From Swiss-Prot:
Top-level EC class as recorded in UniProt: hydrolase
Ligand binding (substrate): N88, R89, D131, S169, N173, K176, H204
GO-annotated biological processes: lipid A biosynthetic process
Subcellular location(s) of the protein: Cell inner membrane
This protein's name: UDP-2,3-diacylglucosamine hydrolase
Catalytic activity annotation: UDP-2-N,3-O-bis[(3R)-3-hydroxytetradecanoyl]-alpha-D-glucosamine + H2O = 2-N,3-O-bis[(3R)-3-hydroxytetradecanoyl]-alpha-D-glucosaminyl 1-phosphate + UMP + 2 H(+)
A GO term, aspect molecular function: UDP-2,3-diacylglucosamine hydrolase activity
Amino acid sequence: MNKLALQGPLWLASDLHLGPATPATAEAFLGLLQAAADEASALLLPGDIFDAWIGDDVIRAAPPWLAAVLHGIRAAAGRIPVYLGRGNRDFLIGQELADALGAHLLPEPVLLETDYGRILLTHGDEYCTDDSAYQQFRAMVRNPQWQAQFLAKSIPERLAMAEQARGESQAANQAKSMEIMDVNPAAVEAALREADVDVLVHGHTHRPARHVLSVDGRKRERWVLPDWDCDHADPPRGGWLVIDRDGLQCFDLVEDED
């Protein structure tokens, strides 16, 4: 399994879903980047940083909203290590983007060796095994051959395909129960058992919480990262997780601003 040893306070945030229609969320994220650079020893972003990512070549002529976000990440990465994960919306994030930002690609899943101990980190969509239609889609778009064929298309073609896929996904999700789109308990237990860890951190489900469970007679924890929306949600929402020698603590974006 991929391993990553990091010391000091680690900040984690996911599911920002940044795009041209999320200026307030982007502004909040830029604030998080500055705060993390001041207070954290590393920042980890395990997936769905962007609402869509059609290939790293978009940075060569980035629209203003994206240029501002990339500038913020680059500035933070100049002060602390920044790790970019890939989610179900931005699975095409690649080495070109990481190199341009002075950041690192976050392997998935990854076993973090922290001051608090060993922690399993991943985006989380792989645990939603009850949603068979989504798992088929995930297997397709993670296939290197499919990715190569997609990236060979023009940017306008890729944008149109991404917009169509997003619309189909939203329509399909409206017909699915929340339980189907959540993680499967057996898949979570299997991951904890295989990694031999007591703590799992993931995003994806937009259901922030700390779950305590027992696996093989051991107390385990599953921490779910919050999603961000400061543009369309009322009240705005977002947050991040801090891992240090004392444990794990989740901070709410709105409460922190008050």
